[in-house]
Amino acid sequence: KKHFAVIGLKNTDLDIHVIHPISQFITDNWKNKQYNTQRKHANNVVKFLNYLVDNRKKLNISTLCDLNIVHGTQYLNDLTLTGVKRSTVKDAERTLTHFYYWLVKIDVITNVSKNAFEKKESHLGTYFESPFKPLYPTKTNKEIEHTLPISYIPLLLEVAITVAKPIALGLYFQIFGGLRVSEVVNLKRTQVARRMREGDFILKLQNFRTDLKEHSSVKKARTQRVLEVNDWGHSLFRDHIKLYKPIDNSNALFINRDGKALSQRSYRQYFQKTKDYFINLLENHGDNEQKLIAKHLKYMKWSTHIGRGTFTNIIAEDAENPYEIAHLRGDSNIDSSLTYMVSTERIHKKIESKFSN
C-alpha cells in the first residue's frame, strides 16, 4: 500500500480540508521516494507557506509570484531565531531551494533567474546550491551518546518495568535486537515468533500500522532476530501480552493507557521518563562510578536510538567480521545470510555469558 504526501488548505471555521495544486511540487520531485521523505519536504513547504501568510504585509507579498530570494533568506533567519537546531535550518533550506527552483521552472516566479541555482556534483549525485544566505544556529557542544555500558542494561530494564512498563518489552527489543523506535511501534501481536531451540524472538518488520504518522514507518522491511538473554525477553513478553491488549482492532503489540495503538511520540515520552528516573537513581543512590556515569549521561544527548547503538556495541565485541554485525542488525537481507547463522549462535552464547557473570 503506497502512501503519498500532499499539501492541503484548511478552512479553520468549517474544519474542511482540500488538496492544494502545489502538491504537484512533492510529486514532481519525490514521487518515487519513501513516504517519510515526501512528508518531510511537504512539512517544510507548509511551514514556509504559513510563514508567508502570517507575514504577508511585512513581506509585501500577495501571491507566490511576488517571491524573491530575500524572502526565503528572511524565513530561514526567523527559523534560526526560534531556537531550532542547525540541522533543522539546513533541512528547510534544502527543501526551499528545490521549491524556488520548481516555481521558477514553471514560471510562477519570474523575478528570479534559473542562473541563481548553480548545479553542483557530489558523491551522492547532482544538486543545486542554495541561493539563500541565512544565519545558521551555532553548532551545539552537546555530543550524542550512542551506547550504554553493558553492565547498566539490567538496571535500565528494571527501571523501565517500574516507571514505563508499556514499553519495557520494546526497550528489550531495541537493546537485544537493534530495532528502531519506528519498527517497535509498527509491531503487531501476531508478528512475533520464537525459535524453539534458543528461545530467540523472530520479528516480522513491516509497515503494518498504516495509522501511524510522525516519521514512524519501518526503514527496511525484514525478518529481525532478537536475542533471548537469561530469559528476560520471555518474561517481559509473557507479562506484556497478558497486560496490554488493544481495544481498537489495531492488534498492535504496544498500546497506550486507553488501549489504543501506541504512537512514536508516546513511546518517546515513556522512554524519557525511564531515562530521567535511571539517571536520578544513579545520581542519588549510586557509588562513585555510578555517579560519574550519571553525570556523563546527563550531559550527553541520548534517546531511544541508544538501544540500537548498544546492540551494535554488544555484538561488535564478539563478531569476527563486519558481515556478522550487518546480519544481526538487519542491515543485509537475512534470507541471503545463512552463512552467518552459525556465527550468530556463537555470539549469542558469548553475550549471554556476559550477563550471567
Feature locations, PLM:
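Short, basic (Lys/Arg/His-rich) helix/loop patches that form interaction surfaces
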Residues: Q272-H327
